[in-house]
């Protein structure tokens, strides 16, 4: 496994007294080059006028509703009455939509000793998808490593291909240009069952990111049906666009204990008001990935920095559960500075609940890996280390293996 000795982690081991908080904030301020980067001065630590994070009350619920109405869209249905579990498959609409699960279990797991679960969304290699052979080989190797890493610690790893729920990228773009009679069976997935395909889409109709998050919730339904899996200790994680999905899943479904976004960028952890040159913009997302968000999001394209609510507030909706935000130092498009800054700003929601927020042993964690936009075993290792606290487990795989002796 590749090591990154210079990775930037935000993991203070000592208690957070006032002096340590000041020292930590100064360090982060220096790393972010606040004078050059922050476009809204009231966001800088130590200045007056920093808005208080919402409490877990009607105000916070109002922020959640705003994002569903104006950004991600609303799911038209919860758990379908006709949903069936057939082994490791979830059948919806009489089998018109099938979510196929790749499940890896740790040794010694049983209904008497259920294990925590890490749920990973994929869109490339869980099952055959159009991907170049050399890239597919790399992706499969990384997934094998993820399985090993999770199961060695005593966690189950569940993966599924989000294209089973709704089409993405080239599929969506190709389908939208085809005549209806030439589309493959159920080409639109859950959109075809419950609405959301391009024709007749309303302003707050769910986009693909919300639909994939809905799929995660259906996988959680399946997890709850399995006695060998502990549905109270489930983490959802994803990379890039699927990192956005992990955050939406955690906010919209409180059964998930942990949400982890890796390089999620705009539409995920990166705040719109902290845009700087080189970082993706909302207008780009809606031009080239028109299906990700709901149509109402387009009204903010011309002035996204002045949206009524932003992603640090969205991240705060995970409180009082657990949040982990990972970035890559050279992933300019995702904006690692903004991602990490939003996570620390969101942390104040936990602190208002008298819970430890930002920090490795707190409820909010994160790291910045040196390198490009990627989801590596190193990222996954740091996240599994973080999960030791919410899962109530040991940190090292060696200690976890001893539990099975």
Language model: regions and residue ranges:
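Bacterial N-terminal signal peptides that target proteins for export
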Residues: 25-37
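Short, Lys/Arg-enriched N-terminal segments with co-localized hydrophobic residues
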Residues: 16-25
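Short hydrophobic alpha-helical segments enriched in small aliphatic residues
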Residues: 5-7, 14-17
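Alpha/beta-hydrolase-fold serine-hydrolase catalytic core, especially in secreted/extracellular enzymes
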Residues: 48-100, 105-113, 121, 127-133, ...
């Amino acid at each position: 496994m590749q090591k990154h000795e210079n990775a930037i982690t935000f993991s203070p081991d000592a208690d957070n007294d006032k002096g340590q908080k000041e020292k930590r904030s100064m360090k982060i301020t220096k790393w972010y080059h606040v004078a050059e980067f922050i476009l809204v001065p009231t966001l800088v630590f130590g200045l007056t006028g920093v808005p208080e994070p919402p409490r877990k009350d009607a105000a916070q619920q109002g922020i959640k509703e705003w994002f569903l109405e104006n950004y991600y869209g609303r799911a038209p249905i919860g758990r379908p009455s006709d949903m069936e579990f057939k082994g490791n498959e979830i059948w919806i609409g009489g089998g018109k939509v099938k979510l196929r699960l790749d499940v890896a279990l740790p040794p010694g797991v049983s209904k008497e000793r259920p294990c925590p679960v890490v749920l990973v969304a994929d869109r490339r290699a869980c099952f055959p998808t159009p991907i170049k052979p050399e890239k597919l080989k790399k992706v499969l190797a990384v997934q094998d490593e993820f399985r090993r890493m999770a199961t060695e610690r005593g966690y189950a790893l569940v993966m599924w291909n989000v294209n089973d729920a709704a089409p993405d990228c080239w599929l969506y773009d190709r389908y939208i240009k085809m005549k209806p009679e030439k589309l493959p069976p159920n080409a639109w997935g859950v959109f075809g069952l419950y609405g959301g395909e391009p024709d007749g889409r309303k302003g707050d109709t769910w986009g693909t990111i919300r639909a994939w998050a809905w799929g995660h919730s259906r996988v959680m339904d399946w997890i709850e049906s399995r006695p060998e899996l502990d549905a109270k200790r489930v983490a959802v994680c994803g990379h890039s666009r699927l990192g956005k999905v992990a955050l939406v899943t955690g906010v919209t479904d409180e059964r998930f204990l942990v949400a982890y976004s890796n390089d999620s960028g705009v539409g995920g952890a990166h705040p719109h008001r902290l845009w700087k040159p080189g970082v993706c913009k909302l207008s780009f997302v809606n031009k080239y990935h028109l299906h990700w968000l709901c149509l109402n999001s387009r009204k903010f394209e011309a002035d996204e920095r002045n949206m009524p609510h932003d992603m640090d507030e969205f991240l705060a909706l995970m409180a009082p559960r657990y949040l982990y935000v990972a970035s890559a130092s050279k992933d300019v498009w995702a904006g690692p500075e903004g991602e990490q800054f939003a996570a620390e700003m969101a942390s104040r929601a936990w602190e208002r609940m008298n819970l430890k927020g930002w920090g490795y042993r707190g409820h909010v964690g994160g790291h910045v890996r040196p390198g490009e936009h990627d989801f590596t075993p190193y990222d996954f290792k740091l996240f599994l280390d973080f999960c030791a606290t919410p899962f109530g487990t040991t940190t090292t795989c060696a200690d976890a293996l001893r539990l099975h002796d």
